[in-house]
UniProtKB/Swiss-Prot annotation:
<comment type="pathway">
    <text>Carbohydrate biosynthesis; gluconeogenesis.</text>
</comment>
<feature type="active site" description="Electrophile">
    <location>
        <position position="95"/>
    </location>
</feature>
<dbReference type="GO" id="GO:0006094">
    <property type="term" value="P:gluconeogenesis"/>
</dbReference>
<dbReference type="InterPro" id="IPR020861">
    <property type="entry name" value="Triosephosphate_isomerase_AS"/>
</dbReference>
<dbReference type="GO" id="GO:0004807">
    <property type="term" value="F:triose-phosphate isomerase activity"/>
</dbReference>
<keyword id="KW-0413">Isomerase</keyword>
<dbReference type="GO" id="GO:0006096">
    <property type="term" value="P:glycolytic process"/>
</dbReference>
<comment type="function">
    <text>It is also responsible for the non-negligible production of methylglyoxal a reactive cytotoxic side-product that modifies and can alter proteins, DNA and lipids.</text>
</comment>
<keyword id="KW-0456">Lyase</keyword>
<dbReference type="GO" id="GO:0019563">
    <property type="term" value="P:glycerol catabolic process"/>
</dbReference>
<protein>
    <recommendedName>
        <fullName>Triosephosphate isomerase</fullName>
        <ecNumber>5.3.1.1</ecNumber>
        <ecNumber>4.2.3.3</ecNumber>
    </recommendedName>
</protein>
<dbReference type="InterPro" id="IPR022896">
    <property type="entry name" value="TrioseP_Isoase_bac/euk"/>
</dbReference>
<keyword id="KW-0312">Gluconeogenesis</keyword>
<comment type="similarity">
    <text>Belongs to the triosephosphate isomerase family.</text>
</comment>
<comment type="function">
    <text>Triosephosphate isomerase is an extremely efficient metabolic enzyme that catalyzes the interconversion between dihydroxyacetone phosphate (DHAP) and D-glyceraldehyde-3-phosphate (G3P) in glycolysis and gluconeogenesis.</text>
</comment>
<keyword id="KW-0389">IgE-binding protein</keyword>
<dbReference type="GO" id="GO:0005829">
    <property type="term" value="C:cytosol"/>
</dbReference>
Length: 248
């Protein structure tokens, strides 16, 4: 079944980079990339247009956040319409740093996802559990609740890529083993089968994030339900090409 879902690798630059750094990233992104892998990079808002104008056309560009309405008195926010006006077609929503540093709750994230889809963007909603939640055997409870909040606002699953990112593995150097990651991905796919539809379960890509590196990407990519990666720090380095080519 996995080979019916196109492998997907997203890079999340977070609050990193300037034009000189972006130029460096663009130079190594011109290297040989597996044509069977869809690639998207998420850059800071102020560099959306610059990145889109200079990045090779076969690589998508994502914003790292947006708000749930088209315009208005929401200082510091950007709308999906603005992202599209910059020539970009993707947005990352609900990243653990948005949830845990900025206090965004499940319902707000769901509303953002819904509006972004209505506005014509493709969306990467992020879910994942904290270390204490995993250690208390609450992983399924947490990620299923996050999924349950998302579902009512998802109007078009073909434009959604779910990113499972265990919070305890983001930027810590700790990585879920391929077995741990595959286990959660398989359970998420079964949840979609039971709560949305078998078709959505089989067609929706579920990608893994959390200290993905050139050293561990190939083992993770061999599993049946991991359809790609959302990569943080490594997406700023030439190693990102190795990760993109994990299934090559």
């Amino acid at each position: 079944m996995a080979n019916q879902r196109k492998f997907f690798v997203g890079g999340n630059w977070k609050m990193n980079g300037d034009k000189a750094a972006i130029d460096g990233i663009i130079s190594f992104m011109k290297g040989p990339l597996n044509a069977d892998t869809e690639v998207v990079v998420g850059c800071p808002q102020c560099y959306l247009m610059y990145t889109r104008e200079h990045m090779p056309a076969n690589i998508g560009v994502a914003a790292q956040n947006c708000y749930k309405t088209a315009k208005g008195a929401f200082t510091g926010e950007i709308s999906p319409a603005m992202i599209k006006d910059c020539g970009c077609e993707w947005v990352i929503l609900g990243h653990s740093e948005r949830r845990n540093v900025f206090g965004e709750p499940d319902q707000l994230i769901s509303e953002k996802v819904g509006h972004a889809l209505e506005a014509g963007l493709k969306v990467i909603p992020c879910i994942g559990e904290k270390l204490e939640e995993r250690e208390s055997n609450r992983t399924e409870e947490v990620v299923f609740a996050q999924m349950k909040a998302l579902v009512p606002n998802i109007s078009d699953w073909s434009r959604v890529v779910i990113a499972y990112e265990p919070v305890w593995a983001i930027g810590t150097g700790k990585t879920a083993t391929p077995e741990q990651a595959q286990d959660v991905h398989a359970k998420l796919r079964q949840w979609l089968r039971d709560n949305v539809s078998p078709q959505v379960a089989e067609s929706t890509r579920i990608i893994y994030g959390g200290s993905v590196s050139a050293g561990n990407c190939k083992e993770l990519a061999k599993t049946g339900d991991i359809d790609g990666f959302l990569v943080g720090g490594a997406s700023l380095k030439p190693d990102f090409v190795t990760i993109i080519n994990a299934r090559a």
